[in-house]
């Protein structure tokens, strides 16, 4: 309908731009113009508009230009239709085509990278990954669908305070590179939690693995659920497809592209995802700048002048935004949730040598600063765009990006880029987590690598991989059918609490030579998060002090205190 309203303007603008070219119009391209016009109503949901010969000539000429530009077919296709009108709203079919195009490309990468892939390739990538490829893959690994949706939307309430934590992340990356990586390479571990077996015993080993399982399964399922909910609104509700089919389809695709190559496949597909995610981010910023008529200098000036761009908070030590709180929490969070997380470290440990792994981690640290800063800048631009255009402000900050991308009157390319960025981030997160869960369950809980031959190990690994995908789909459905924000927030908190005992166990093991009564370790690991939650409640209600991300530090400290109480005497075996 909007296409019809814009027809006269479209004719004048494009005819003037292509007047000379139209004089030399080649009749061979008439079939292309007719094909595009017939498909237009299918893609954008409007009624078919009868257009005269002039527009057919114009569209044919545009098609010729894009055909000769050597762009991908999918990109050219959307660029042609985006040029019809700057106000076309992205339809469900356009979303579907974008998603299917990306998934097709993903499967091509997965197929190529998983050739001759065995168990070693699945678990460790054969330890042959070039360090720069591992670094590019880690950028995608660090960004989930939640990052893509929530970080830009958070700037209205939190400003750029997240950058304080990112500074802590950078310090944490150096700790991982020069403390943890040499230890893991020296022990030649497949799963990180094998260290706990070597240091304390099998019970501590399985305790660490089970806590990782709970955290990763619930945390990743929640991230996938959030993106599935967005896709449900964009596509599936339009066709009456239930949410369970959405979740099942998503996890089936994730299982299919990771089931052969594992880590070896992840490295290459995550590199593709990094390119898609960063390109989507940068190009969306460019389109927003153009939409508001800003140059690069104008954009820098506007962002710097905005109160939403404040980074440092030194004024209130009791605030959750206080610099030293967020900086120290960033260090601890990064070490615990990256350095002691099988999901994140499996890429780092796929490099051939510790030195290569260290180079990869340091490069990732500096790239991460740049990418997160761009997400925050995007957030400021989104809010300014909503203000300048009079778009209705969504009830939740998480919906701002989707609102502007899909309904903001920007070129269709912005909607396409939003969907590509969203899908690439969630497939990276889910595929990586599924591989890590399969590795940890097979190696740590079933201990299949110790007693199975290669053929039996392959069979076990494949069964576990299917089971992990099915389990994650069930958890995603659980989030949908409970549909309670308080339950979802509780799951996020529980997932965060589980990293405290893991951090405490590793720090205790690496900083002391004490042996513990291994069989009691599960009790300590359960008690520490409970005590941390109690401390947080008392601090808030009685001391009027808000414990934020630094709760992880207290959690780890309680774990270490419990392990100290379990220390064996010198004459005790």
Language-model segments: what does each one mean?
Residues 1, 15, 20, 43-44, ...:
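Hydrophobic residues within membrane-embedded alpha helices
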Residues 2, 12, 17, 30-34, ...:
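Basic polycationic patches enriched in arginine
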Residues 40, 52-65:
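Compositionally biased, low-complexity peptide segments typical
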């Amino acid at each position: 309908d909007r296409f019809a309203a814009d027809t006269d303007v479209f004719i004048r603008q494009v005819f003037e731009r292509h007047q000379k070219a139209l004089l030399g119009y080649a009749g061979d391209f008439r079939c292309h113009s007719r094909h595009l016009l017939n498909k237009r109503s299918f893609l954008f949901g409007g009624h078919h508009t009868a257009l005269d010969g002039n527009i057919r000539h114009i569209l044919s000429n545009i098609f010729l230009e894009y055909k000769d530009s050597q762009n991908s077919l999918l990109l050219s296709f959307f660029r042609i239709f985006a040029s019809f009108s700057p106000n076309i709203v992205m339809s469900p079919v356009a979303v579907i085509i974008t998603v299917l195009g990306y998934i097709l490309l993903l499967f091509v990468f997965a197929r190529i990278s998983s050739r001759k892939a065995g168990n070693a390739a699945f678990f460790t990538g054969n330890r042959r990954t070039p360090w720069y490829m591992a670094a590019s893959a880690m950028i995608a690994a660090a960004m989930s669908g939640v990052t893509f949706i929530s970080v830009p939307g958070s700037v209205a309430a939190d400003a750029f305070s997240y950058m304080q934590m990112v500074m802590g992340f950078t310090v944490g990356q150096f700790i991982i590179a020069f403390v943890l990586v040499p230890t893991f390479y020296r022990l030649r571990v497949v799963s990180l939690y094998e260290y706990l077996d070597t240091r304390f015993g099998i019970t501590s080993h399985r305790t660490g693995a089970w806590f990782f399982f709970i955290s990763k399964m619930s945390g990743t399922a929640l991230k996938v659920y959030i993106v599935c909910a967005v896709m449900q609104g964009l596509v599936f509700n339009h066709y009456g497809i239930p949410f369970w089919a959405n979740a099942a389809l998503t996890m089936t695709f994730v299982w299919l592209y990771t089931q052969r190559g594992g880590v070896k496949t992840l490295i290459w597909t995550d590199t593709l995802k990094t390119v898609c995610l960063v390109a989507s981010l940068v190009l969306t910023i460019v389109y927003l700048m153009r939409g508001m008529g800003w140059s690069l200098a104008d954009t820098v000036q506007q962002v710097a002048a905005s109160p939403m761009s404040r980074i440092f908070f030194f004024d209130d030590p009791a605030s959750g935004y206080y610099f030293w709180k967020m900086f120290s929490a960033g260090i601890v969070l990064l070490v615990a949730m990256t350095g002691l997380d099988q999901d994140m470290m499996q890429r780092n440990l796929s490099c051939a040598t510790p030195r290569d792994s260290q180079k990869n981690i340091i490069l990732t640290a500096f790239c991460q600063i740049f990418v997160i800063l761009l997400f925050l800048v995007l957030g400021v631009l989104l809010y300014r765009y909503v203000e300048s255009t009079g778009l209705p402000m969504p009830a939740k900050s998480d919906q701002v990006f989707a609102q502007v991308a899909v309904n903001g009157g920007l070129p269709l390319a912005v909607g396409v880029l939003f969907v590509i960025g969203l899908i690439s981030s969630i497939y990276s997160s889910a595929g990586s987590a599924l591989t890590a869960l399969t590795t940890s369950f097979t190696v740590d809980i079933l201990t299949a690598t110790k007693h199975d031959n290669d053929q039996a190990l392959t069979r076990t690994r494949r069964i576990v991989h299917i089971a992990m995908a099915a389990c994650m789909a069930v958890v995603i459905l659980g989030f949908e059918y409970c549909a309670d924000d308080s339950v979802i927030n509780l799951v996020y908190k529980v997932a965060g609490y589980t990293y405290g005992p893991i951090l405490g166990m590793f720090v205790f093991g690496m900083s002391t030579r004490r042996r513990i009564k291994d069989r009691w370790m599960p009790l300590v690991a359960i008690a520490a998060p409970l005590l941390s939650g109690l401390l947080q409640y008392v601090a808030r209600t009685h001391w009027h002090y808000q414990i934020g991300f630094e709760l992880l530090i207290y959690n780890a400290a309680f774990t270490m205190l419990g392990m100290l109480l379990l220390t064996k005497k010198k004459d005790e075996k």
